[in-house]
C-alpha cells in the first residue's frame, strides 16, 4: 500500500496492536481539540447590511471562536448574505458612531481577539459599500438560488417572509432581488395587486397565444383618437412588450386595470377567470370596431352549435343557431354521486339529448298538439382556440352552502373533437325547420347560459357597460374532414382553494420550445407533464360528497386547446418582424426601464433621515426629512438643509451647521468639526431605511461661535429660580460630563448664569414632579441620576429658606406649583342683552358677606372706570375667603381652621359685581327659570350631548417662562404679611408639603361611586350646600384675544391654574367672570376636532387637562343629585328625516312621565315654537334612530323607566287621543305597499291588544279594506323607517311568514315601534319598460341616498365584474 501522510493511519502487516494504538491516539487528539474549542471564548458578531433599504432591518448573527481570523469572518458573512467576498466592507460600531472607524481588512489573518473583538459580548458590525460600489451578488444573473425553491412548485407559493426565520437573510434578499432580476426561464411574471391572480393567469395565457399576440401587435394606437390611459388594447400592447423585453422578474398590471376603469378597491375583489375572459373579450370587440381586428375574437374563440327539438311522432325539428366562446362542462351530473372521469365523457354528456315527455311534452307545429320530443345540442363549428370550462363550483341545497367539486377529471394533451361535430347538419340543414327570430345574433352558450349572452339585457346583468352586438359569423365549410379537428392543449388555468375563495395560476405550454411553465403571479418556473396530471383533481383517501364544501384543493378549472393546423398555426413575431410602432414602443419602454433602474440606484444610495431646526426668529421647532446621497459631503448637506428649512432670508449660511441629535431626549449627541468634506454615508454609518438618531440644523448669531459637542457629554437645561419674584426663568443649556462632581457642576453653572456657587442650590427634576436636591458635593452626576438630557433648577439667594427641610422650603413649594400649573383658554358666554339680565339675577341672588379683610393687599387695576379682570378676581376670592372663615367660626367644632375642609354655601355669596349695600334676593326657582328662558338662543347653541368623564390623563407641565407670580392676578392675597408669599396666598400649612400629601390628593381622580346612580356628580349635597373644594390652589386669569376671533360679544380668558384643583373649585373661581353662580353654568372641554364634551364630575381634578386646552363656558343649570340631562327629539314618521332635535331637558329620579311632560310644555313653546296640550303628545324610548316603548303618563323614572346619562327620548305629536293605555298593548307602525302603482303609502299606527297575527291581519283589513284572506305582510329590515326600494320590496322581503304570534322567529316583535309592510296578494305588479325602470331606479337611488339607506338589500351579494369602456365607472345607477 502507498505510504500515507503524517495525519493518515496506514495499516501494516503484523502490527495490529500498533495500529489500534494509533487509532486511540488520534481519537484522543480529536477529543482534546473539541474540548479546547469548547473552552475557548467565543465572539458574538451581529452584522447589519446597510447597503440598501430592503435589508437594513435584517441582522446576521455569527458566534465564532475568538481565534477565528478576520478573513474567515468575511467568508462566513459572504456565504450568509450571498455576496462575493471582497466587494463589501465590514465596519465596527463603537457604541456611538461608525464614522470614525476604519473598515476591517478582508484579507487579514489577525484573530478576532487581536482585532479588539470582545468575547462574551455583542459585537456590532455594519456591512457597507466598498469604495462607493454596492456589493456584487453571487447569483445576480441566474438567480439559481431563487428558482431552486420554486423550480418544481406549481401550487400557490407562500407569501414572502412567511418562511420560518433564520439568522441568515438569504430569503429576505431574494424577496428584494426577485423583483429586479428576470427568472432563468426567460419569462416575466405579473405582480398580484391584491386579488388579481385570476387576471394574471388570463393575461399570461393571451400573451403565450401567438395568434392573439401577433394580432395585437399589428394594431396601432392613434394618439389623436383616444387617451392612452383608457385604451385597453394599447395598455395590453405595452404589457406584452414588457413581458417580452423587460429584465425584471415581475411587472405591474396597474396600467391595464386602470384602462378597465378600475380603482384600487377593485384589486380586492375576487372574480372568476372565465367571467373576466368574456367581459374582456367583449370590451376588446368594442374597442376594435372598424379596425382589422374587429372580428379577431370571433375568428379565434367563437364556435357554433345548434339547439334543436325534434318531434318523435312526425320527425319535425325546430332549431336555432347559437354561438359560444367556451363550452361549460359539468363535473358531476345533478343528483349523481359519481363524477365524469374525463373531458371526453363530459363532452358526450353535453350533447346527449333529453326526452321531453309527460308534463314536459313539446307542442309540435306540424302535429298541432303536444308530443314527445327529443331536445339537445349539436356542435356545428369548433373555434380555432377551444376553451373548456370545468364547472367545479356548485350549490348544495342540503347544507345551503356553495361548494367546490374536487373530483378527478382527466383531460388529454391532444383532444380529437371530430366525434362531436355534426357534419351532416352543417351540410344540409332541414329546409322545413323553424329558426327562432334573431337566432343568428343571439349570442353564445358561454358559462351557464346557452343563449342571449350578448343581448342587451345580459350586458346590463353582467355589468358590462356597453351595448354589445355580435358580428356576422362565417359558416364552416361543408365537407369538413374529421382528421382536421385534432386539438393540442397549451393552457391549463388552475384554481387552488375552496368555494369560499382561493388562488388562480396558469400552466402554459410554450409553442417556442414545447416546454410547460407555471405562471404563478410573479413566479415563473419550468414544470413537467407529471405536474400537469396533478391538476386533474381528486384526492388521496375517501371523501364524502359534502366534504368539499370547505375543502381546499388544487385542480384545473379552465382548459384552452389550439387546433393543430400547420396552415394556420402561427409563430411569435421576431424582433425584426415587429411593426414600426411596436419597435418604437419597445424602445420607449426600455428607456423608461433604464430610467427606473437609475432612479432605484439613486434611492439605494440615498440617506433619509429626520431633520430638525429651531427657527432663529420664530423660535419654533421645524421638522422635515433630509434626503441626501451618501457621497454628498457634510458641507453640501448643510446647504441642502439650509434651503429646505427656508432660512435664506433669515440667517447666513455660515451661521448654520448639522449636528447629531436625539429628538426624543432633546439631546445634542455630537458635532462634526473638521469633517465638512466627509461623505454623509460615512458620517451616518451607511444607507439605512431608519436611523436611531436625527440631525439638527443648529444656528448661531453672527457674533457667536459654535460650541463643540463631544460624544459622552450630557446636556443640562438650567432654569434660574427667583424666590423673591417667584419666577422661573427660561432655560440655559450647559454641557457636562457624568463623572463630574456636584461641586464641579456648580462651578460650570456659575460661569453660565453668573450666580455665586457657594450659596447655590441645585434641584434635579428626574421625571415629572420628581424633584431631587443635590446636597452631596462629592457625588458624581452619574450617581445622582443624570442621563443624556436633564433639567435642573438653581437659585443662590442667601435666605433662611436654606435652613428648612427641602420639602418644607419655599423653593420646593414654588417648583411644585410650577410643575403642576397648566395654561387653559376659556371662552366665556356671549355678552348678549339676555346675559345682562342673567348677571342681574346673579347679583340679586347674593347676600352681603361682609367687608374685605383690611390687611389684604389690594391689587390696583388699570386706570379707568372698569375694573380689570385681575381686580375682579382678587376681590371675589377675598370675599369667598372671608365667607369661608365666617362659616368656620359658625361651625366652631370643626377643629383647626387651617385644616378645615367645610365648603361654603354659594347661595349666600355676594358677587363682586354687586352694587354696595344691595340686599335684594330672589327665589332660587325663579332664578333658574329666568336663566333658562331669558335667552333661548344660548340654549339652542348648547352642545347636543353631554358626556361622562373624559378619561385621557395627560400630565403636561407649563413651560418655565410662562409662570410668574409677580403679576397682579394671584387669586388670594396674603393674610399675614410676615409670611413668605406663596403662589396661592395661603400659608405653608395649607399647601401640600410632602409627596405623601400629593399621593392622597391623587385619590380625588377616582370615580365617585356614591353618585353613580345619577350619572353625574351633583354640585350640591343633600342639604343643598356646595361640595366644591375649598382648598384654593393657584389660579390666575388674564384677558386674552383669540387669533381666529370669536365673534362680537365673546370674551376669552387665559387661565393659569394648578391642575390639582377640583372642577368645583375651578368653577367657583370663574364665577366673577361668567356673572352667575357656578351652579348655573356648564364647562365643556373642546378637543382638537372641535368636538365639545361636558365635564360634569365636580369632585375630580383637572389632571386630565394639558397645556393650551380650550374650555367653553355655557349658561345652564348644573345637575343636582338624582337629575339627568335628557335630549328630546321629535319623531316625524312620515318625514324624509324622521328624527328632529328639539331641546335638552332635565328629568329627575321619582318624577312621573306626566310631570316631565308638564315641564316640557313651556320650554317647547318658547324654544321650539310648539304649542301642545299635555294629552296631544307622548314620550317614547329612543334607541339610535328607532322608536321604542311608549311611556305612559303614570310611569315613574328610575322605577318603571331606567334612565341614564346621555339619555335620549322621542316626543311624538298625536293626531288624536292617546290609544295606548296599558303596557300589555303593542303599538306597531304599518305601511301599505301598492305593487300596481309601485308606491308606498304613509305610515299608520296600529295598537294591538295582544301579539296575535290574526289580530294584526284584522286591523290591517279594517284600515285598508283588503279582504282578510288577501292580506300579506312582512317585517321591515334595518333601522327606522326601514326604507327599501320599490323595485325590490316585492321580492326581497319575507312576505307572509308562517307564524301565529308576533314574538317568534322570524318576526321577533316584542316591543313598540316595529315596522310592518302589507299588501293585497291579488294585486299584480306594474309592468315597467326599460326606460321606466331606469327612471324609477334613479329616483329611488336618490331618495334612499338622502335617507342614508342602500338602494337594495342583498346580504353578501357578489360584485359583478365590469370593464368600463370610458375608463371610469359609470355613475348611472342603471348600470349597477
UniProtKB/Swiss-Prot annotation:
Q: Does the entry feature the keyword Hydrolase, yes or no?
A: yes
Q: Which residues carry this modification: Phosphothreonine?
A: 1016
- List, alphabetically, the InterPro entries matched: Papain-like_cys_pep_sf, Peptidase_C19, Peptidase_C19_UCH, Ubiquitin-like_domsf, USP47_C, USP_CS, USP_dom
| Predominant cellular place of this UniProt entry's protein | cytoplasm
Q: Where is the composition biased (Polar residues)?
A: 430-452, 930-939
Biological process terms from the Gene Ontology for this record are: base-excision repair; DNA damage response; intrinsic apoptotic signaling pathway in response to DNA damage; monoubiquitinated protein deubiquitination; negative regulation of intrinsic apoptotic signaling pathway in response to DNA damage; positive regulation of canonical Wnt signaling pathway; proteolysis
Q: Which keywords does this chain's UniProt record carry?
A: Acetylation, Cytoplasm, DNA damage, DNA repair, Hydrolase, Phosphoprotein, Protease, Thiol protease, Ubl conjugation pathway
What Pfam families does this protein's entry cite?
Answer: UCH, USP47_C
Q: State the active site.
A: 197 (nucleophile), 503 (proton acceptor)
Q: Which residues form the USP domain?
A: 188-564
GO cellular-component term (any): cytoplasm
Compositionally biased spans, kind Low complexity: 882-900, 954-970
Subcellular location(s): the record lists: Cytoplasm
Chain intervals for the UniProt region annotation (Disordered): 426-452, 835-863, 880-971, 985-1025
Question: Which residues get modified to N6-acetyllysine?
Answer: 122
Q: Which residues carry this modification: Phosphoserine?
A: 832, 911, 934, 1014, 1018
SUPFAM superfamilies recorded: Cysteine proteinases (SSF54001), Ubiquitin-like (SSF54236)
Query: Which catalysed reactions does the entry list for this protein?
Result: Thiol-dependent hydrolysis of ester, thioester, amide, peptide and isopeptide bonds formed by the C-terminal Gly of ubiquitin (a 76-residue protein attached to proteins as an intracellular targeting signal)
Record's family? Answer: Belongs to the peptidase C19 family. USP47 subfamily.
Q: Describe, as the record does, how this protein assembles with itself and its partners.
A: Interacts with BTRC and FBXW11. Interacts with POLB.
Q: Which PANTHER family match?
A: UBIQUITIN CARBOXYL-TERMINAL HYDROLASE, UBIQUITIN CARBOXYL-TERMINAL HYDROLASE 47
**Under what name is this protein listed?**
Ubiquitin carboxyl-terminal hydrolase 47
Gene name, Swiss-Prot/TrEMBL: Usp47
Amino acid at each position: 500500500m502507498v505510504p500515507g501522510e503524517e495525519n493518515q493511519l496506514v495499516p501494516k502487516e503484523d502490527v495490529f496492536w500498533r495500529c489500534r494504538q494509533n487509532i486511540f491516539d488520534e481519537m484522543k487528539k480529536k477529543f482534546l481539540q473539541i474540548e479546547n474549542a469548547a473552552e475557548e471564548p467565543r465572539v458574538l458578531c451581529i452584522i447589519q447590511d446597510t447597503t440598501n433599504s430592503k435589508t437594513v432591518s435584517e441582522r446576521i448573527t455569527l458566534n465564532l471562536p475568538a481565534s477565528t481570523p478576520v478573513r474567515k469572518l468575511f467568508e462566513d458573512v459572504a456565504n450568509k448574505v450571498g455576496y462575493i467576498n471582497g466587494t463589501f466592507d465590514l465596519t465596527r460600531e463603537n457604541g456611538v458612531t461608525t464614522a470614525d472607524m476604519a473598515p476591517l481588512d478582508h484579507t487579514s489573518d489577525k484573530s478576532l481577539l487581536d482585532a479588539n473583538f470582545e468575547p462574551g459580548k455583542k459585537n456590532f458590525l455594519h456591512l457597507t459599500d466598498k469604495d462607493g460600489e454596492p456589493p456584487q451578488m453571487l447569483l445576480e444573473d441566474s438567480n439559481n438560488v431563487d428558482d431552486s425553491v420554486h423550480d418544481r412548485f406549481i401550487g400557490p407559493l407562500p407569501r414572502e417572509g412567511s418562511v420560518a426565520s433564520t439568522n441568515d437573510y438569504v430569503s429576505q434578499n431574494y424577496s428584494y432581488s426577485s423583483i429586479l432580476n428576470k427568472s432563468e426561464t426567460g419569462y416575466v411574471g405579473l405582480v398580484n395587486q391584491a386579488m388579481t391572480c385570476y387576471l394574471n393567469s388570463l393575461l399570461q395565457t393571451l400573451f403565450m397565444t401567438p395568434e392573439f399576440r401577433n394580432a395585437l401587435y399589428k394594431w396601432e394606437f392613434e394618439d389623436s383618437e383616444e387617451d392612452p390611459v383608457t385604451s385597453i388594447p394599447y395598455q395590453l400592447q405595452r404589457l406584452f412588450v414588457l413581458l417580452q423585453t423587460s429584465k425584471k422578474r415581475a411587472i405591474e398590471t396597474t396600467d391595464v386595470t386602470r384602462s378597465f376603469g378600475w380603482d384600487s378597491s377593485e384589486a380586492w375583489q375576487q372574480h372568476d377567470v372565465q367571467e373576466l375572459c368574456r367581459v374582456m373579450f367583449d370590451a376588446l370587440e368594442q374597442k376594435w370596431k372598424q379596425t382589422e381586428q374587429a372580428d379577431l375574437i370571433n375568428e379565434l374563440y367563437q364556435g357554433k352549435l345548434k339547439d334543436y327539438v325534434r318531434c318523435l311522432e312526425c320527425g319535425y325539428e325546430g332549431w336555432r343557431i347559437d354561438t359560444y366562446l367556451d363550452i361549460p362542462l359539468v363535473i358531476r351530473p345533478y343528483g349523481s354521486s359519481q363524477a365524469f372521469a374525463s373531458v371526453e365523457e363530459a363532452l358526450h354528456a353535453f350533447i346527449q339529448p333529453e326526452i321531453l315527455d309527460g308534463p314536459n311534452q313539446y307542442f309540435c307545429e306540424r302535429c298541432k298538439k303536444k308530443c314527445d320530443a327529443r331536445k339537445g345540442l349539436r356542435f356545428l363549428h369548433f373555434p380555432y382556440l377551444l376553451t373548456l370550462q370545468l364547472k367545479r363550483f356548485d350549490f348544495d341545497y342540503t347544507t345551503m352552502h356553495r361548494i367546490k367539486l374536487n373530483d378527478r377529471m382527466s383531460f388529454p394533451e391532444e383532444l380529437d373533437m371530430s366525434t362531436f361535430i355534426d357534419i351532416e347538419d352543417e351540410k344540409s340543414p332541414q329546409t322545413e325547420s323553424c329558426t327562432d327570430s334573431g337566432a343568428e345574433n343571439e349570442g353564445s352558450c358561454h358559462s351557464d347560459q346557452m343563449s342571449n349572452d350578448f343581448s342587451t339585457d345580459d350586458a346590463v346583468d353582467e355589468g358590462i357597460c356597453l351595448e354589445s352586438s355580435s358580428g356576422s359569423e362565417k359558416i364552416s365549410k361543408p365537407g369538413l374532414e374529421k382528421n382536421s379537428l385534432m386539438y393540442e392543449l397549451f393552457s391549463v388555468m388552475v384554481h387552488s382553494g375552496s368555494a369560499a375563495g382561493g388562488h388562480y395560476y396558469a400552466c402554459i405550454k410554450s409553442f417556442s420550445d414545447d416546454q410547460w411553465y407555471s405562471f404563478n403571479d410573479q413566479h415563473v418556473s419550468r414544470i413537467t407533464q407529471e405536474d400537469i396530471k396533478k391538476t386533474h383533481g381528486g384526492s388521496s383517501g375517501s371523501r364524502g360528497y359534502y366534504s368539499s364544501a370547505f375543502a381546499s384543493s388544487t385542480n384545473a378549472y379552465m382548459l384552452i386547446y389550439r387546433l393543430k393546423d400547420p396552415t394556420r398555426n402561427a409563430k411569435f413575431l421576431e424582433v425584426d418582424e415587429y411593426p414600426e410602432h411596436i419597435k418604437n414602443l419597445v424602445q420607449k419602454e426600455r428607456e423608461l426601464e433604464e430610467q427606473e433602474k437609475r432612479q432605484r440606484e439613486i434611492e439605494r444610495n440615498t440617506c433619509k433621515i429626520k431633520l430638525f431646526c429651531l427657527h432663529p426668529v420664530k423660535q419654533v421647532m421645524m421638522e422635515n426629512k433630509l434626503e441626501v446621497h451618501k457621497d454628498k459631503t457634510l458641507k453640501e448637506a448643510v446647504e441642502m438643509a439650509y434651503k429646505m428649512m427656508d432660512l435664506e432670508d433669515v440667517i447666513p449660511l455660515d451661521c448654520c451647521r448639522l449636528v447629531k441629535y436625539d429628538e426624543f431626549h432633546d439631546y445634542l449627541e455630537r458635532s462634526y468639526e473638521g469633517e465638512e468634506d466627509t461623505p454623509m454615508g460615512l458620517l451616518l454609518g451607511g444607507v439605512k431605511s431608519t436611523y436611531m438618531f436625527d440631525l439638527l440644523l443648529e444656528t448661531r448669531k453672527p457674533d457667536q461661535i459654535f460650541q463643540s459637542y463631544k460624544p459622552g457629554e450630557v446636556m443640562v437645561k438650567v432654569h434660574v429660580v427667583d424666590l423673591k419674584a417667584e419666577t422661573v426663568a427660561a432655560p440655559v443649556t450647559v454641557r457636562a460630563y457624568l463623572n463630574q462632581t456636584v461641586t464641579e457642576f456648580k462651578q460650570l453653572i456659575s460661569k453660565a448664569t453668573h450666580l455665586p456657587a457657594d450659596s447655590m442650590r441645585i434641584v434635579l427634576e428626574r421625571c415629572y414632579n420628581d424633584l431631587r436636591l443635590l446636597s452631596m458635593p462629592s457625588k458624581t452626576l452619574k450617581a445622582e441620576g443624570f442621563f443624556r438630557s436633564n433639567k435642573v433648577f438653581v437659585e443662590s439667594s442667601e435666605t433662611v429658606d436654606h435652613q428648612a427641610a427641602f420639602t418644607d422650603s419655599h423653593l420646593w413649594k414654588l417648583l411644585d406649583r410650577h410643575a403642576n400649573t397648566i395654561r387653559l383658554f376659556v371662552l366665556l358666554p356671549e355678552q348678549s342683552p339676555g346675559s345682562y339680565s342673567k348677571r342681574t339675577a346673579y347679583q340679586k341672588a347674593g347676600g352681603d358677606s361682609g367687608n374685605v379683610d383690611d390687611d389684604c393687599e389690594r391689587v390696583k387695576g388699570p386706570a379707568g372706570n372698569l375694573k380689570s379682570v385681575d381686580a375682579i378676581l382678587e376681590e371675589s376670592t377675598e370675599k369667598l375667603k372671608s365667607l369661608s372663615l365666617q362659616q368656620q367660626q359658625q361651625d366652631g367644632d370643626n377643629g383647626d381652621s387651617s385644616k378645615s375642609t367645610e365648603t361654603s354655601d354659594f347661595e349666600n355669596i355676594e358677587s363682586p359685581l354687586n352694587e354696595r349695600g344691595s340686599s335684594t334676593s330672589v327665589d332660587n326657582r325663579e332664578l333658574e327659570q329666568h336663566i333658562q328662558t331669558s335667552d333661548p338662543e344660548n340654549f339652542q347653541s348648547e352642545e347636543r350631548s353631554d358626556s361622562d368623564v373624559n378619561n385621557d390623563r395627560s400630565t403636561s407641565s407649563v413651560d418655565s417662562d410662562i409662570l410668574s407670580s409677580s403679576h397682579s392676578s394671584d387669586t388670594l392675597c396674603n393674610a399675614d404679611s410676615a409670611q413668605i408669599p406663596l403662589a396661592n396666598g395661603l400659608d405653608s400649612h395649607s399647601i401640600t408639603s410632602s409627596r405623601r400629601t400629593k399621593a392622597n390628593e391623587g385619590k380625588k381622580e377616582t370615580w365617585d361611586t356614591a353618585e353613580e346612580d345619577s350619572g353625574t356628580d351633583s354640585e350640591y349635597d343633600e342639604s343643598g350646600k356646595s361640595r366644591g373644594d375649598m382648598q384654593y390652589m393657584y389660579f390666575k386669569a388674564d384677558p386674552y384675544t383669540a387669533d381666529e376671533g370669536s365673534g362680537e360679544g365673546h370674551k376669552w380668558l387665559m387661565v393659569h391654574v394648578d391642575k390639582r384643583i377640583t372642577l368645583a373649585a375651578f368653577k367657583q373661581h370663574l364665577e366673577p367672570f361668567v356673572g352667575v353662580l357656578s351652579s348655573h353654568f356648564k364647562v365643556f372641554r373642546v378637543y382638537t376636532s372641535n368636538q365639545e364634551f361636558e365635564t360634569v364630575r365636580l369632585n375630580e381634578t383637572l389632571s386630565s387637562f394639558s397645556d393650551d386646552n380650550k374650555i367653553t363656558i355655557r349658561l345652564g343649570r348644573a345637575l343636582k343629585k338624582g337629575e339627568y340631562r335628557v335630549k328630546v327629539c321629535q319623531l316625524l314618521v312620515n318625514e324624509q328625516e324622521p328624527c328632529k332635535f328639539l331641546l335638552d331637558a332635565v328629568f329627575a329620579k321619582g318624577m312621573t312621565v306626566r310631570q316631565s311632560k308638564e315641564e316640557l310644555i313651556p320650554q317647547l313653546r318658547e324654544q321650539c315654537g310648539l304649542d301642545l296640550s299635555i294629552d296631544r303628545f307622548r314620550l317614547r324610548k329612543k334607541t339610535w334612530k328607532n322608536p321604542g316603548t311608549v311611556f305612559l303618563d303614570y310611569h315613574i323614572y328610575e322605577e318603571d323607566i331606567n334612565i341614564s346619562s346621555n339619555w335620549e327620548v322621542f316626543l311624538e305629536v298625536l293626531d288624536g287621543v292617546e290609544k295606548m293605555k296599558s303596557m300589555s298593548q303593542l303599538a306597531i307602525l304599518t305601511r301599505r305597499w301598492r305593487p300596481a302603482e309601485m308606491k308606498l303609502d304613509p305610515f299608520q299606527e296600529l295598537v294591538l291588544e295582544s301579539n296575535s297575527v290574526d289580530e294584526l291581519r284584522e286591523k290591517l283589513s279594517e284600515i285598508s279594506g283588503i279582504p282578510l284572506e288577501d292580506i300579506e305582510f312582512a317585517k321591515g329590515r334595518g333601522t327606522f323607517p326601514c326604507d327599501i326600494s320599490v323595485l325590490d320590496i316585492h321580492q326581497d322581503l319575507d312576505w307572509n311568514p308562517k307564524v301565529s304570534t308576533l314574538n317568534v322567529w322570524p318576526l321577533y316583535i316584542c316591543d313598540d315601534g316595529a315596522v310592518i309592510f302589507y299588501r293585497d296578494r291579488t294585486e299584480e305588479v306594474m309592468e315597467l319598460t326599460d326606460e321606466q325602470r331606469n327612471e324609477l331606479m334613479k329616483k329611488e337611488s336618490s331618495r334612499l341616498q338622502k335617507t342614508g339607506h342602500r338602494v337594495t338589500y342583498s346580504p353578501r351579494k357578489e360584485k359583478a365584474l365590469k370593464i368600463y369602456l370610458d375608463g371610469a365607472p359609470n355613475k348611472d345607477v342603471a348600470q349597477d
